[in-house]
Amino acid sequence: PQSGTALDENVKEEIRAFKMDQSKVKVPWMLLEIVQNDDRIDVVKVTKKAGPSDNLETLREELKQREVVYFVLDYEPSEEKRAKHNIPKGKTYPLTCFWSMETANIKLKMKYSSTVGTLKSATSTLKTYLEAHDFDDLSEEAIGDKIKNF
């Protein structure tokens, strides 16, 4: 029997493409969830990608519908933060996040948290990792604290 949860064969390529093509949407993001593949084995798979009209608000709406999920986000600081820290307009910070509501099912939390290492290795080029349990953890201040040189 397989221990842990593997990545779907396309995840690394989809993350690489996400990092390379960040021009199509203002705040691009992707959701990654643990699902069963055709062989009935649990795998981490991209289940939703941001579209042209999506933004941080639509990501929040998606998160409200899920107790536990991973996502990658290309975060762009607000105009105020850019001015304060002399960050050029258009500069973004790709990050990986483990979203786990405080009220989430404990078995589901454990299933996802046991796979964090595998996901981190696949998203290592995104550098910043964030764990969030409520929307305060996804505030600009909280994200800024996690991003180096911010």
From Swiss-Prot:
Q: Which InterPro entries match?
A: ADF-H, ADF-H/Gelsolin-like_dom_sf
User: Keyword set for this entry?
Assistant: Actin-binding, Repeat
Q: Name one GO molecular function term.
A: actin binding
Occurrences of domain ADF-H (ranges): 3-148
**Keyword field contains Acetylation:** no
Pfam families in UniProt: Cofilin_ADF (PF00241)
Report the protein's function.
Depactin interacts with actin at some of its 12 N-terminal residues and 20 C-terminal residues. Binds to actin monomers from filaments and in solution.
The family this protein is said to belong to: Belongs to the actin-binding proteins ADF family.
Q: Specify the protein name.
A: Depactin
Q: Which organism is it from?
A: Asterias amurensis
